[in-house]
Amino acid sequence: MIQMQTNLDVADNSGARRVMCIKVLGGSKRKYASIGDVIVVSIKEAIPRGRVKKGDVMKAVVVRTAKDIRRADGSVIRFDTNAAVLIDNKKEPIGTRIFGPVPRELRAKNHMKIISLAPEVL
């Protein structure tokens, strides 16, 4: 469950390390984002010579949340950290690699490129 001012780790090699959610997209008064939702983020920490720099405003897809997600079969999945992958306006990832596992709920939200780049799909 991600809301405004939430800090997230970046799970790709775009050059950003930490981002902060500044808006949850989808609906006029939407408060929370979950896995697979698109948010607007501000880059708070970045590495030198990366594709993005500190202060940039970008879109991102939430790929891991500490809040547990209930699946249709009754199982629950949760992660240790909140993490996102930076995307462009065409919903393509900016980085060329994804770090860490991603849930298969991204497939239902049509983020197939992220699923194919991920080392593990839970």
UniProtKB/Swiss-Prot annotation:
Keywords: Ribonucleoprotein, Ribosomal protein, RNA-binding, rRNA-binding
Cellular component, GO annotation: cytosolic large ribosomal subunit
Entry keyword RNA-binding: yes
Pfam families per the UniProt record, alphabetical: Ribosomal_L14
A molecular-function term among this protein's GO annotations: structural constituent of ribosome
GO biological process: translation
Coiled-coil residue windows: none
Protein name (Swiss-Prot/TrEMBL): Large ribosomal subunit protein uL14
Taxonomic placement: Bacteria, Pseudomonadati, Pseudomonadota, Alphaproteobacteria, Hyphomicrobiales
Protein encoded by which gene: rplN
